[in-house]
C-alpha cells in the first residue's frame, strides 16, 4: 500500500495532497498542469516535499518531521516516463539489465523469461532503441522497470507520446502488467479512456489538490471531453 501526505511550493503553484493507493492499479487523473507529475516525482524521490510523509508497503520513504528522505536509488520504485528514456547506445538486452545491475541484483533467469514473454520482447533483444517503434520502446521501458524488482511502479503518461495505433498496440501489455506482474501501479494520465481500462481506484487531482477519490465512475464522459 502507498500512503502519501505531502505539501510542496513550486513558485506560485502549491501542492497539498493526501491519498492512499491500495489496489493493483490506482490512477492519478486530472488536467495538464494539475500537479500529477510533481506528485509522483515526490514519491520517486526526484523532488523533496516541503512537508509531509510517504510510505510504501509500510516502509518510510519520506518524513519531514523525522528528517527521513530515502534517496531515489534506494526506494525500489520503477518509473516509466512518457518517452521511455532508453539508452540509445545499448541493446535492448542491456537496457533491460540496467535497473537490475544498478541495484546489484543477480539475474533471475525465470523472472527474465517471464517478463520478456509477457511483454513479447524476445525478438527485440539484439536491437538498439533507435530501430524500435514508439510502442516497442515503451514495452522495453516497462520491462526494465519490472526487472529491478520494484515495490511500486509509477507510470507517467506512458502513452502520451504515441499515436493512436501505437496506443492501441501497447494498452493490452499494460493490462497484462496489471494482472500478471504482481507489482502495484500508480498510473498518471489526463485521458479517461486509458484509465477506464487500467485503474480500480481513481484519485482526481486539480490545481494541486485531491478533489475526489473513488472508482472508475469518476471518469465520466464529461471528464473525457473536458480533459482529453
What name fits each language-model region?
Residues 59-64, 107-124, 175-176:
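Conserved ABC ATPase "signature" region
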Residues 61-78, 102:
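ABC ATPase NBD coupling module
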Residues 90-109, 118:
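ABC-type ATPase nucleotide-binding domains, specifically the catalytic core motifs of the NBD
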Residues 128-132, 136-138:
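Conserved ABC ATPase signature
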Residues 147-151:
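A short, proline-enriched helix->beta-strand linker immediately N-terminal to the Walker B motif
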Residues 153-157:
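Catalytic Walker B motif of ABC-type/P-loop ATPase nucleotide-binding domains
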Residues 182-188:
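Conserved H-loop
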Amino acid at each position: 500500500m502507498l500512503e502519501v501526505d505531502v505539501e510542496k511550493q513550486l513558485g506560485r503553484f502549491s501542492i497539498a495532497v493526501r491519498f492512499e493507493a491500495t489496489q493493483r492499479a490506482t490512477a492519478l487523473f486530472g488536467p495538464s498542469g494539475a500537479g500529477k507529475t510533481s506528485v509522483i516525482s515526490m514519491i520517486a524521490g526526484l523532488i523533496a516535499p516541503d512537508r509531509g510523509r510517504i510510505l510504501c508497503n509500510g516502509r518510510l520513504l519520506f518524513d519531514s518531521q523525522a528528517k527521513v528522505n530515502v534517496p531515489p536509488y534506494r526506494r525500489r520504485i520503477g518509473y516509466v516516463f512518457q518517452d521511455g528514456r532508453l539508452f540509445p547506445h545499448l541493446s535492448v538486452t542491456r537496457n533491460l539489465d540496467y535497473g537490475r545491475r544498478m541495484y546489484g541484483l543477480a539475474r533471475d533467469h525465470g523472472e527474465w523469461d517471464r517478463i520478456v514473454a509477457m511483454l513479447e520482447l524476445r525478438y527485440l533483444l539484439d536491437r538498439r532503441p533507435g530501430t524500435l517503434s514508439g510502442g516497442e520502446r515503451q514495452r522495453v521501458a516497462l520491462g526494465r522497470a519490472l526487472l529491478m524488482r520494484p515495490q511500486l511502479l509509477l507510470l507517467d503518461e506512458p502513452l502520451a507520446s504515441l499515436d493512436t495505433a501505437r496506443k492501441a498496440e501497447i494498452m493490452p501489455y499494460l493490462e497484462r502488467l496489471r494482472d500478471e506482474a504482481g507489482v502495484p501501479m500508480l498510473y498518471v494520465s489526463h485521458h479517461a479512456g486509458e484509465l477506464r481500462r487500467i485503474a480500480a481506484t481513481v484519485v482526481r487531482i486539480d490545481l494541486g489538490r485531491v478533489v475526489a477519490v473513488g472508482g472508475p465512475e469518476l471518469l465520466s464522459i464529461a471528464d473525457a471531453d473536458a480533459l482529453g
